Amino acid sequence: MVLIKAALIGIFAYPGDTILKWSIKDFGPFYLPSRGDTIVMDDKHYLLYRNLIEWEQQDKLIASNGHFYLNGREVEHYVFMHNYYFMGGDNCYNSQDSRYWGPLPEEYIVGKATLIWKSKNRVTDEICMDRIFKKIK
């Protein structure tokens, strides 16, 4: 997995999205929020950030006729409370990563990849024994 921190990254409208029409390979642009970042609530931001806001607030973010409600109150802006990371797999077409499940809150990161655990030859589908347990540079 690759960790990418706080940059303009195309993610999180899930492959197959019919509104933004992003694909698995052509995502974005999407701003990866950090603690203290503020967004204006609109239809696009609702689509992109709803899951993060609901996770932070532990409540549903409701959209109704161009207005947005959280905890029973209308919201025009939202200030993020956490830092988020994009987790990207090394195989664009066959990775279940942040393009599917969204940005990962910083507090959920518990380690750092340091070794290659498994490596397969893309042509023969055989394990590349010479790469297993090599350090990641």
Predicted ranges, named:
Residues 1-137:
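Extended hydrophobic leader/signal-anchor segments used for secretion and membrane insertion
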